[in-house]
């Protein structure tokens, strides 16, 4: 597994270099399911690059990835979950605050995750049997303190409408941040800068963080308190295990019928 982990980090860094080299080119921006659901030429090229690299080394591995129709279940033998550019709107509009995310599973068990903040050259990597790091520095275990001393991150629409009581939770916290990228939000949690992140996500949006956070004391669950299914878009949150009950006291009582 160490060789596979090292290989994954290597190809993710190569993909990041490719993005930085070509991000000023014509991106051929398209809209998928809505006016704000953007995809670029580089989303597709980076995913193809990663898949091709992996298959050249591990020809029997399978994939669940954002672009196209790669939808293998993580419960199969060897499955990579890939989001080639998370935060595509940030990528297009700002040229920063976007990331590559890769997770690797064997028979449903997360082996390692990688979140690579492309413009900051910040690689969050580890999980499973590996200690979680930011580049070469160990990531901190969760340190508890009162809810009112923590920032949280969330979905702007959920906050505005108080869906699931997210606005109520934000009022009990130190404040709320909206980053426009699951990867960037998760990286802030892993660094100890945020308590929790609440939004709607697809499996490729949270797979890497679910593996990275486990050993640091964090968990990803649905807003109805169940394990995520790694198959569909769901309302989810990442939060410290020891804070889940307190957060649930704001969230779950107000869930939509």
Label every model-predicted segment:
Residues 1-85:
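N-terminal subdomain of lithium-sensitive/metallo-dependent phosphomonoesterases centered on the IMPase/IPPase/PAP
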Residues 19, 43, 54, 88, ...:
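Residue-level signal for inorganic ion chemistry
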Residues 25, 98, 126-130, 214, ...:
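A short, compositionally biased
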Residues 31, 72-74, 107, 125, ...:
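Solvent-exposed alpha-helices and their adjacent loops that cap or buttress functional pockets
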Residues 44, 67, 84-87, 118, ...:
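Generic detector of well-ordered alpha-helical packing
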Residues 134-138:
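A structural micro-motif at secondary-structure boundaries
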Residues 142-257:
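An extended, acidic
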